[in-house]
C-alpha cells in the first residue's frame, strides 16, 4: 500500500512538471512576451501638446481669402456652425463611457516606475525575461497613454470652444459696447442651427421647460411657436419679466429643517416689506404639506407684517435628461434655477440667509448693472486652501486657466473678452489658480442678469453634468466639503461674454459680541475675538454697512439648544476678583482705615476686606435672550497662509475652527435634529501687527442698527 502511494506521488509530480513546462513553452505569443519595441521611441509631452490645440473652424478661417469679419454677426455665426455641422465625423465625445482619466498620466516618473514594476512582476517566470527592455517598453506604453489623454483633452478643449461661440451667438443679448452686435434669431438658418447644436453641446438638456405652480395651479410651459430652439425659448420666457427672488431647495438636505428655514426666511422678507416675487425651485418632489406650509407663511394675513409675498413653485425635473439626474448637486440646482427661471434679473437666496436690507437695493450696484453678475466672497478660511494635492491637481488647474478661457481668436472673430491681470476680478480668482483655494463664492446670496450670463450658466451646466466625475474632479472637488460652487463663476469666466466677473470687494465678516478679555487665547493682548457659527457680508460702498447674516448660529440654538447652550456658557462666563467684607474678623477700631506696618508705612488695604473670586455671566445672559446679538463686527485680515507668530502669542490665522462644537448633533447631543453647523472664532489682528502680523478692522454697531437687527432676528426665531 505504501509502495503504491509513493508511486502515485512520483507520477503525479512528473505529470505536473510536464504540464507546467508545456504551458510555458506553448503559451500564445501575446502572453509569453511583451509587444515588440519600436526602435524609434516616440517622445510625447502631454502638457506641451496643449499649445497645439486649435479650433478647427478658426483654422479654416485663417486660411480663407475672405475675412469673416466682413459679415455681420448673424452671418458669421451661421457660417461657423454650418461649417462645424458639415465637418466630417463631427461629434462631441463629452463623456466617453469607455474612457476615464488616469491621474498618474500627469506624473511621468511615477507612472513609469509603477509600470516597470508591474511588467517585471508579470514576466517574473518567463525564461526570456532577461531579453526584455522593460524600461523602453514602459516608455513606449506611456507615450500611447499620454496621446490618448491628449486626445481627451483636445476633445474637451474643442467642446468648450464651441459652447463659448454658441453662447455668444445664441445665448446672450449682452452688447456691452460690443461692435459685433446681436444675432438675428428670426433668421430660419440661425433657428435651425441653434436647435441642432443644443443637442450636441448640451446633451444634458431634455428640451423641456420647467413646470410652474402659481396660486396652487400648475401652469404648462409657455412655448413660442416662432422658434424651435430651447435656448431661445428660455430667453424669450424671461425677457422683460423683471426682477425676482429664487430660493432653491437643495437635494442633499433631506431633513425637514430646510422647509422650516425657508419658512423663516419668508417671514423675514415680509418683515422687510419685500415686493419682489419669489420662485421656490426644486428637482425632487416636494410634499403638498411643505408647499402649503410655505404658501401659508407667505400669504396669510398679518397685521404686524402686512406685505404678502408672491410665491411660485418651480419643478425643474423636466429640464434634464434621465442620464444626469443622479448627479444633481447643490450647485447644479442653482445653475438650473438660474437658467430656467422666469425672471430676467434675480437674486438667489439659500435657506441659511437673513437679509438685513431691502433686496431691491442689490440691483442698484453699478458694477452689477454693467456686467450682470455679483458674487459675495466666502469666509477666507485657510481650510479652503488645498494643501494635499490630488495627482494631476496643478496640471488640470493649468488646463482650465490656459486652454479653456477665451483666446486671441475668440477676441478677433467674436469680440469675446480675454482675461488678464488688468481686470478687477483677477485678485480674487488668483486665490483659485495660484493659491489653490476652493469655494470662492458665498452661496448665501448671488445676483444674475440672465441676458448677460446665460452663456456662462450653460457652461456651468456642462461642468456639472458632463465632467463632474472625470477630469475636473481632480481639481474642483479636492476639498473636504465636496461642494462645487466654483463652477458658477468658472462658467462666466470661460464664456468671455463679460469683461469682468464681479465680486464684492470685501470678504465675509463675523458679527456678534466680543469675547471677554479674560477668555481670549493665552497671552493675547492685541486682538479682539468674536465667536459664532454665523457670518455676514458688508457693503463695498462704505465697507461698514451690514447687508446680510447667516442663520447657522440660530439653527444650532434651536435644534441643539441644551448642548449648544452649555458650550456657550463655558465660552462666555469669566472669573473676576472682588473685595468683600470679612465677617470673620472683628475690628474694634471701626474708625481706622489704614494700618501701619513694621517699617512705619501705611497699608491701603483694609484688613476688614477679603478678595473673593466671582463668576460673571452677564455676556452669557445676553446670548440666552438673543442667541445672535450683534454689537460688534470684525473684518478679519485676509490670509493665504498662516502667519508665523515667532513666539508672539497671538492667533496665526483669522478663522479658527472650534473643535468642541463639532459634537453638536452627534451621538444624541443636544436632543436636536440634524447635524450642527461649525463654530468659528475670528480675530481682528493676526500675529504681531508691528512686525510680520496683519491687522483687520473692528466696527461698533450703532444702537439704532442693533435694534433693527434684533427685530429681524426675532422675526426669524418666531414659530
UniProtKB/Swiss-Prot annotation:
**UniProt membrane topology term:** Single-pass type II membrane protein
Keyword annotations for this protein, in alphabetical order, are: Glycoprotein, Glycosyltransferase, Golgi apparatus, Membrane, Signal-anchor, Transferase, Transmembrane, Transmembrane helix
GO biological process annotations for this chain's record?
protein O-linked glycosylation
Question: Which molecular function terms from Gene Ontology are attached?
Answer: alpha-1,3-mannosyltransferase activity
Q: Which residues lie on this side of the membrane: Cytoplasmic?
A: 1-4
Ranges that cross the membrane:
5-22
Output a single Gene Ontology CC term carried by this record.
Golgi membrane
Q: What induces it?
A: induced in low iron conditions.
Broad class of enzyme this protein falls into: transferase
Top-rank lineage group of the source organism: Eukaryota
Q: In which pathway does it act?
A: Protein modification; protein glycosylation
Give the Enzyme Commission number: 2.4.1.-
Query: Which residues bear sugar attachments?
Result: 148, 273, 449
Q: Where in the cell is it found?
A: Golgi apparatus membrane
User: Per the record, what ranges lie on the membrane's Lumenal side?
Assistant: 23-719
Briefly state the protein's biological role. Answer: Responsible for addition of the terminal mannose residues to the outer chain of core N-linked polysaccharides and to O-linked mannotriose. Implicated in late Golgi modifications.
Which protein family is it in? Belongs to the MNN1/MNT family.
Its name, as the record gives it, is Putative alpha-1,3-mannosyltransferase MNT4
Q: Which organism is it from?
A: Candida albicans (strain SC5314 / ATCC MYA-2876)
Starting at the broadest rank, the lineage of the source organism is: Eukaryota, Fungi, Dikarya, Ascomycota, Saccharomycotina
Gene that produces this protein: MNT4
Amino acid at each position: 500500500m505504501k509502495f503504491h502511494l509513493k508511486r502515485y506521488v512520483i507520477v503525479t509530480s512528473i505529470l505536473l512538471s510536464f504540464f507546467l513546462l508545456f504551458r510555458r513553452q506553448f503559451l500564445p505569443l501575446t502572453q509569453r512576451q511583451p509587444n515588440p519595441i519600436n526602435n524609434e521611441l516616440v517622445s510625447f509631452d502631454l502638457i506641451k501638446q496643449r499649445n497645439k490645440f486649435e479650433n478647427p473652424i478658426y483654422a479654416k478661417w485663417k486660411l480663407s481669402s475672405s475675412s469673416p469679419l466682413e459679415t455681420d454677426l448673424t452671418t458669421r455665426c451661421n457660417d461657423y456652425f454650418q461649417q462645424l455641422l458639415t465637418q466630417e465625423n463631427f461629434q462631441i465625445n463629452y463623456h466617453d463611457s469607455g474612457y476615464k482619466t488616469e491621474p498618474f498620466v500627469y506624473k511621468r516618473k511615477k507612472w513609469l516606475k509603477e509600470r516597470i514594476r508591474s511588467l517585471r512582476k508579470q514576466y517574473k517566470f518567463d525564461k526570456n525575461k532577461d531579453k526584455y527592455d522593460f524600461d523602453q517598453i514602459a516608455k513606449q506604453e506611456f507615450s500611447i497613454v499620454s496621446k490618448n489623454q491628449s486626445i481627451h483633452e483636445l476633445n474637451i478643449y474643442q467642446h468648450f470652444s464651441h459652447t463659448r461661440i454658441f453662447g455668444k451667438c445664441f445665448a446672450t443679448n449682452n452688447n456691452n459696447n460690443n461692435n459685433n452686435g446681436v444675432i438675428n434669431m428670426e433668421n430660419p438658418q440661425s433657428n435651425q442651427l441653434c436647435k441642432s447644436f443644443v443637442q450636441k453641446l448640451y446633451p444634458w438638456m431634455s428640451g423641456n421647460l420647467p413646470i410652474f405652480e402659481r396660486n396652487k395651479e400648475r401652469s404648462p410651459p409657455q412655448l413660442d411657436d416662432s422658434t424651435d430652439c430651447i435656448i431661445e425659448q428660455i430667453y424669450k420666457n424671461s425677457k422683460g419679466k423683471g426682477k425676482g427672488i429664487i430660493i432653491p431647495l437643495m437635494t442633499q438636505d433631506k431633513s425637514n429643517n430646510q422647509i422650516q428655514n425657508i419658512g423663516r426666511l419668508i417671514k423675514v422678507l415680509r418683515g422687510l416689506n419685500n415686493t419682489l416675487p419669489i420662485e421656490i425651485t426644486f428637482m425632487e418632489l416636494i410634499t403638498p404639506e411643505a408647499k402649503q406650509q410655505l404658501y401659508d407663511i407667505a400669504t396669510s394675513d398679518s397685521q404686524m407684517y402686512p406685505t404678502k409675498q408672491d410665491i411660485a413653485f418651480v419643478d425643474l425635473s423636466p429640464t434634464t435628461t434621465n442620464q444626469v439626474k443622479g448627479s444633481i448637486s447643490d450647485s447644479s440646482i442653482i445653475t438650473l434655477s438660474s437658467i430656467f427661471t422666469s425672471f430676467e434679473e434675480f437674486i438667489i437666496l439659500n435657506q441659511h440667509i437673513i437679509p438685513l436690507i431691502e433686496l431691491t437695493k442689490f440691483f442698484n450696484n453699478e458694477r452689477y448693472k454693467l456686467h450682470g453678475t455679483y458674487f459675495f466672497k466666502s469666509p477666507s478660511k485657510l481650510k479652503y486652501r488645498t494643501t494635499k494635492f490630488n495627482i494631476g491637481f496643478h496640471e488640470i488647474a493649468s488646463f482650465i486657466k490656459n486652454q479653456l478661457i477665451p483666446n486671441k481668436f475668440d477676441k478677433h472673430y467674436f469680440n469675446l473678452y480675454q482675461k488678464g491681470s488688468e481686470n478687477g476680478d483677477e485678485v480674487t480668482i488668483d486665490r483659485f489658480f495660484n493659491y489653490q483655494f476652493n469655494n470662492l463664492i458665498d452661496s448665501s446670496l448671488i445676483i444674475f442678469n440672465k441676458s448677460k450670463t446665460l452663456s456662462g450658466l450653460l457652461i456651468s451646466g456642462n461642468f456639472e453634468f458632463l465632467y463632474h466625475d472625470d477630469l475636473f474632479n481632480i481639481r474642483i472637488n479636492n476639498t473636504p466639503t465636496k461642494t462645487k460652487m466654483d463652477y458658477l463663476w468658472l462658467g462666466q469666466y470661460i464664456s468671455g461674454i463679460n469683461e469682468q466677473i464681479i465680486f464684492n470687494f470685501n470678504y465675509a465678516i463675523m458679527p456678534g459680541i466680543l469675547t471677554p478679555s479674560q477668555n481670549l487665547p493665552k497671552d493675547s493682548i492685541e486682538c479682539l475675538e468674536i465667536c459664532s457659527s454665523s457670518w455676514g457680508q458688508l457693503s463695498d460702498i462704505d465697507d461698514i454697512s451690514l447687508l446680510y447674516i447667516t442663520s447657522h448660529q440660530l439653527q444650532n440654538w434651536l435644534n441643539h439648544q441644551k448642548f449648544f447652550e452649555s458650550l456657550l456658557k463655558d465660552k462666555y462666563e469669566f472669573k473676576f476678583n472682588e473685595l468683600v467684607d470679612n465677617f470673620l474678623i472683628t475690628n474694634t477700631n471701626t474708625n481706622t482705615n489704614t494700618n501701619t506696618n513694621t517699617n512705619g508705612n501705611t497699608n491701603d488695604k483694609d484688613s476688614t476686606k477679603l478678595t473673593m473670586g466671582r463668576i460673571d455671566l452677564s455676556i452669557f445672559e445676553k446670548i440666552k435672550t438673543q442667541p445672535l446679538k450683534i454689537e460688534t463686527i470684525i473684518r478679519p485680515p485676509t490670509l493665504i497662509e498662516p502667519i508665523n507668530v515667532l513666539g508672539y502669542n497671538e492667533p496665526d490665522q483669522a478663522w479658527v475652527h472650534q473643535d468642541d462644537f463639532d459634537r453638536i448633533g452627534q451621538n444624541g447631543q443636544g436632543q436636536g435634529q440634524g447635524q450642527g453647523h461649525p463654530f468659528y472664532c475670528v480675530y481682528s489682528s493676526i500675529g504681531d501687527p508691528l512686525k510680520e502680523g496683519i491687522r483687520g478692522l473692528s466696527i461698533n454697531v450703532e444702537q439704532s442698527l442693533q435694534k433693527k437687527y434684533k427685530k429681524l432676528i426675532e422675526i426669524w426665531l418666531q414659530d
